[in-house]
Amino acid sequence: MASLTYDLTLAGLSVGSAAALTGIGLIVTHRATGVLNFAHGAVAMVCAFLLRQFTVEWGWPLALGTAVTLLVVAPAIGVALERLVFRPLAVLGGDPAQTLVASIGVFVLLVGGAALVWGTGARADAPTVVSADPWGQLAVALALAAGVGAVLRSPRGRPLGSRRRTRFATELRAVVDDRPLAVLGGIDADRVAAAGWAFGSFTAGLSGVLLAPYVRLDPYGMPLLVMEVMAVAVAARMRSLPVAVVVALGVAVGQSQLTRLHPAGRAEPLLQAVGANLFVLALLVSALVLPGVGTRDALPRTATARVPTPPGAWIVAVVLFLLPLGFAGSDLHTSVQVPALGVVLLSLVVVTGRGGQISLGQAAYAGLGALFTALLAAGRFPGLPRLPELAALAVAVLLVAPLGVLTGWPAIRRHGLALALATFAVGVGVSRFVFAQPYATSGLSLGRPAGFGGDRAYYVLELGLLTAALLAANALRRGRTGRALAALRDHEPGASAAGVRVPALKLAAFVAGAALAALGGGMLGMGLRAFDATAYDPVRGLLWFAAVVVLGADSVLGALAAAALLVGLDAGARGGVAAVLVGVLAVLVGRFPGGPYEALRTAASHLRLRREVSLTPLGSRVRRRLLPRATPPAARPSPRSGTPSPAAVPAPRSGRGRTAPTAPGSGRSDTTPPGPHIRPGTAPPPSPRTRQGAAPRPSPRTRQGAAASSPPGGRPGAAAASGHRTGTGAVSAPPAGAEPRAPLSMSLRALGLRVAYGGFTALDGVDLDVRPGRVTAVVGPNGAGKSTLFHCLAGTLRPSGGRVLLGGRDITRLPAHARTRLGIARTFQQLAVFPSLTVDENVLVGAEQGRTADPEAAERALRLLGLDGPVRAFPAAGLPTGTLRRVELARALAGSPRVLLLDEPAAGLDTPEVTTLARVLRALAADGTALLVVEHDLDLVADLAHTVHVMVAGRIVASGPADRVLERGYGG
C-alpha cells in the first residue's frame, strides 16, 4: 500500500510539474502584458509538434531540436504575437476584453494551422526531453519559478534581485498599468512587453514538450488539456507563483491518488470522471466560486458594434439558403448542417452581440440539446417516456433552457476576463463530465422526425425551424427588451441607473441563448443521425465564438454567414482551413470593428480618388466681394425639414475651449437648446454667437439675485416643456396633453453614512437632506468623499454604516435599478449614454424602465432638452459632448423621477451650455423635483444651489445658503 501511494504521488508530481509550468507562463504573461493568454495551450501544442518534426521526422539530435524549439522558436512566436497582434491593440488603447478576443483568435489560428500542417490525428511518438522520473520535471518547475520570482521581486525586497531586476519589475508593472504614461516616463514599453511575451511563450513551449510524451498529441486535444490547467493560475489570482506551484502539485497528486479508489455501484463512474478531470473541477471552482479576475472589463464595443447590412444582403441570403433544395447526394447531406449551426450561432447573437456578455460555453448547451433529444427519443431519459423526435426536440429545449443559469449566474457579478473563464469552465465541465462519459452517451442513435427522413425533406423542416429562431432572435433584439439589452451591452452602470433590471436581464439573455443553442444542437444531431460528442467540444465552441464576433456579433445575417462559412470550408477544404481563416479575422477584429464588410468598405473609400476643387486667386477675390451680399449660411433652410442646413450650423463646443462637431442633420446649434426661461409666444434669447462678444460670467451674488427674481409660481419648467421650437427657432404652443406632470414630492436623506476602504475612511458619519423643490449642492476638494457619498445615495455602493431614506422608507440595501424605479434618477461624471442607440431610443429606455410607464414621458423629456428635432434619429455615437449631456439628462427625466442626482453635470461643457443647463435644473426644482449636485464649478453652484454642503476628509464641515458658504472661501 505504501509503495502504491508513493508511486501514485510520483506520477502526480510529474503531471503537476508540467501544470505548474503552465501556470507560471500564464501568470508571467498576464503580469507583463495584462493579457490572459487563451492561446497558451495552442503555443504549447505547436512547440511539441515542432520538436517531434525536428527529431522524429528530420532526425535532428534531441538536444539540438530542444534548443531550437525552446530557445528560438517559442520566444519568436511570443515576440511575433506581441509585435503583430497585441502591440497594435495596446497602442490603440484596446481594453483587456478586446485582447481576449484577439487571443482566442490566435488560439483558433494556431490550432487550425497545426491541423493543416500535421493533420488531425494523434501522435504517440513524441520525444522525451526529461526522463519519466518526476524529480527532474519538478526541479525544472521550481527552478523556473524561483528565477521568475527573483526577476519580478518588488523594489522593496532586494535580497534576491539586483538593481536591474527590480528596475525591470517596476517597468513591467508600469507598462501593464498605463502603457502611454509609461512611455512618457521614458520606459521602452515595446521591449518590456516583448520580453514578457517571449518568456510566456517559452514556458508554454516547455510545458508542451514535457507533456507530449504522456498525453495525446493532436491539434485539438493537447491545447484543451493545457487550458484546463489554467485553473492553477486562476486559483493564484494571476499573481502568486508559489500558490500556482502548490495548487498544481496538490491537484495533480490528488488526481493521481483518486485512481486507486474503485467503489461499487453508481458512484464508480462519477468517481472515475472526477479522478480523470480533477483539474477541470478545480477550474470550475476557481472560475465560479473565487472572486473574478478582471471583473471591471466588459466586452469591447468593437466586438458588438452594430454592423451595417450590405444592400440586398437578405435577398442573397434567402436565395443561397434555398439553393440546397436543388442539390443531391453528399452536397445535400452537407448542407443539412448549415441551418442547424445557424440556429446555434444565433444564440451567440442574443447573448454576446445584443447582451454584450462573453459566452464561451454555447457548444455545451448545443451538445446537451442533441444529447437530451437522443435520450428522449430513445426512451432513456430518467423519468420520461419515449417521445417522437420533434416532441423530444421541443422537450430538450425546455430542459436545457434553465441550465443557462449556469453561465448566467456568474455573469451577474463578472465581466470580461472573469466571465470568459466562467463560461469556458462550464463548457469544459459539461464536455468532460457528461459528453465523455460512456454511461450517458454509449449506444445512442438519433433518428429524424416521421415524414422528414430524407435529406431534402429534413432541410425543409430545418428552414422552418430556422425561420422561427430568426423571428425569436429578432424579437429579443427589438422593442423594449432589445433596447434594454443594448443599454446593458453599451454601458451597464448607465443601464442600471436607467432602471434596467440588470441581473434579471442577464439571466434572461443566457436562458434564451441556451434554448436557441439546444434547438440548434438537436437539429444538428438529427441531421447527422447520431450524437457525436466531438462536434460539441470546447475548442469548437471557441471557434464558433470567434466566427460570430468577426462577422458581426450583433448581426443575425453574420451568424448565418458564419454557419455557411464553417460548414462549407470544413466540407470542401482540408481540415483546419476554416479555423485558420476565422483566426486571422479574429486577430484583426480590433482594427476592423464592423467585420469584413466594414473593412472592405473602408478600404474602398481610401482607394477612391478624391478630387479637390480650389479657387484661383481671381475666383477668391470675386468670392470675397460677393460673400457679404449672399444669404448667411445659417439662415438657409434645409430642403427637407425647413431647419437650418446642418452643414451651415456652427459647431458647438464640447468642452472648455474645444469645439466638437455638430451632429449632421441636427438642425440646430448644440449650444442653444430651448431653455425653461422661454415662454410660449416669445422669441428665444440671442445665441452667444450672434452677440458682439461673449458676456462674462456673472458673479455668484449676481447669479443668486437673478435666480431669486424668478417667480416660483411661474413654473418655468412647464413653460419649457409645453412649447417646442419651430423651424426658425421660435417656440410655438404645445399639442394637447403635453403638460408635464410634477413629481410627487419626496425627500432623500442620508443618516450617519460611513464607508471605509481598508484603513482609509471615505465617509465618517455624513448626514444629508435633499429636499423637494430645492437644489442641494455638495462641494469640496478632490478626495473629500463627494463621489463616495453620491454612490451611496445612487445605490452603486453600500455603506458600512448608516441609512439612506427616501420619503421615510429605508432603501440602504436596494440596488441602483430598484432605486430608479422608486424615483431616484442620476447622471454620471463620465458620459453614460448608449452609443449604438439613437437619441430617441436612449431617452425611451429611461421612459420604459423608470418609475412610471408613461409613453409620453420620452417625448416631453426630448422637448424639454431641445432634442425633439432631427437629431433624435441619430445614433448617440459621435454626437457633441453638450448634446450627449442633454441626452443623458433627458433619459433620467423620462422616468419621472422624484429625486435627481447629478455628478459633475457641467463637465465638458462651455459657458453657454452651462448657462442653459442651469436654466433647465432651476425649472426642474420649481416643478418640485429634489436635486443634488456634486460639482467643482463654484460659479454654477452659486447660480443654482439653495443649500451648499462642504465636505473635507469624509465629513461635512460647513452647510448653508450658497452665497454665505461660498463667500467664506469654502469649497475648494
Which residue stretches match the model-derived regions?
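Transmembrane alpha-helices and adjacent helix-loop boundaries
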Residues: V15-A18, T22, G41-A44, V91-A126, ...
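Catalytic Walker B motif of ABC-type/P-loop ATPase nucleotide-binding domains
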Residues: L900-E904
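Conserved ABC transporter NBD signature motif
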Residues: G802-R809, L822
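A short, surface-exposed alpha-helical micro-motif characterized by mixed small hydrophobic
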Residues: V941-D943
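The feature captures the beta-strand-to-loop junction immediately N-terminal to the Walker
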Residues: V779-P781
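Helix-to-loop junction immediately C-terminal to a conserved catalytic motif
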Residues: A794
